[in-house]
From Swiss-Prot:
The gene is aroC. It comes from Pseudomonas savastanoi pv. phaseolicola (strain 1448A / Race 6) (Pseudomonas syringae pv. phaseolicola (strain 1448A / Race 6)). The lineage of its organism: Bacteria, Pseudomonadati, Pseudomonadota, Gammaproteobacteria, Pseudomonadales. NADP(+) binds at residues 48, 54. InterPro entries: Chorismate_synth (IPR000453), Chorismate_synth_AroC_sf (IPR035904), Chorismate_synthase_CS (IPR020541). This is Chorismate synthase. The keyword Amino-acid biosynthesis applies. PROSITE patterns: CHORISMATE_SYNTHASE_1, CHORISMATE_SYNTHASE_2, CHORISMATE_SYNTHASE_3. Its cofactor is FMNH2. One of its GO terms (molecular function) is FMN binding.
Amino acid sequence: MSGNTFGKLFTVTTAGESHGPALVAIVDGCPPGLELDLQDLQRDLDRRKPGTSRHTTQRQEADEVEILSGVFEGKTTGASIGLLIRNTDQKSKDYSAIKDLFRPAHADYTYHHKYGIRDYRGGGRSSARETAMRVAAGAIAKKYLATQGIVIRGYMSQLGPIQIPFKTWDSVEDNAFFCPDPDKVPELEAYMDQLRRDQDSVGAKITVVAEGVMPGLGEPIFDRLDAELAHALMNINAVKGVEIGAGFDCVAQRGTEHRDEMTPLGFLSNQAGGILGGISSGQPIIAHLALKPTSSITTPGRSIDTDGNAADVITKGRHDPCVGIRATPIAEAMMAIVLLDHLLRHRGQNADVSVNTPVLGQL
């Protein structure tokens, strides 16, 4: 299996399966001298880990990360950073009844046809369990970006049919949904409780924002910053769509509304989401991602077995009724990995470039 490494200068390689002994990652390209300890990584892992509320999977994983290499006396050395998270709460017997069946809308069928063999226990390599390593690696990127004045944060902007207007960052970490409107939390909880009673699942929309990004990141033509972000975010399990800035809403906009006019005091809008011509503009970079409802539900669904016979599939085990609830830290991590990669690439080629034009802020 190829495709396990992401990035060009700052790279992340992951390995491991949902019900294997452990997950591992190798992070290459982190600049030396960055102060880094376990808590820097564990903080974001705790935000993503399962079993933290009744609205997520009840699989109990501590997700305690170990740093195996690349850090000495509390600072990165420039060497590869090895990371490990041990799996401790696998219940593989939950999947024995479907080992010869294909769960509809899962990777079972496509993995079977591509590789001729698949780990049916919790989805194996296709499980979102793998994203724990991305969050750990992304925490390293976030730590370095913070030294450059770049802050990356995310929140849930829609759960099923419930639109969630942004009110304040202050409430995002105070609830299980990463909801920026505290008044919406009771409605979200009631919706999820009913969803569980219905033995069903639902999708979600996540918004992730990077502030403090300098102008100039991005490599046209084929490594545009928005294209790389879309690539990274689409690589998150269950993501079916990505928007940058106004996204698909730009179809209904006129040029007079969509263009981000400039004055000596700053930009008058940010419909472009902080990226123009594939290059960061210095405005906040804003991306939205849509996650599908998982098909791992106990309501029977029609499918086939490995011999092509018709079958009804009921997925037992412990699953998230809305995978978007835990997706915010993953989206933050992938944006951080992309931005650090492009920061290092920009530094390598364009570090000596300077212009007299002032950097505009957002009015």
